[in-house]
Amino acid sequence: MPETGSTVRCKGEKSMRPSWDAYFMEITHVVAGRSTCLRRKVGALIIKDKRILATGYNGAPSGLAHCQDVGCIREQQQVPSGERHELCRALHAEQNAILQAALYGVSIQHATLYCTTHPCVMCAKMIINAGMKEVVIVKTYPDTMAAALLDEAGVTVRYLEEPSAC
């Protein structure tokens, strides 16, 4: 089971080993850096037994043009965040991580998903059906139905604090 909390190393302090949560969330933020979305940079990591099974970030399907190259229809139509997901050409980070595990035949049942933001309702349903047991996040998302579904399915959602600056 991952430990809670994180380690922040400030100038002049001895280097400390980060908790598992801090370690995995830091990797999740690095994964988010690969995102090609013009609106949000989201990363996801699927973990089981302290091992990384799959990663994902939000972006266009493999082989297709990226939003950063062709523009964002949601931006052009001024669609608010959290609405009209079907207009987006990208997959969400959570979806990409789940698909990567499936593509390579990796079971993610009883796994933990680390994500830079709370899953939307579409991703929540995929997390539930994939049999994941826990979601660990640092940012909320305006989707109360997603939170309600995860709760109803018995999927634990834990919030981590963002590391503070020194």
Go through each PLM region and give its residues:
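Zinc-dependent deaminase catalytic domain
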Residues: 1-166
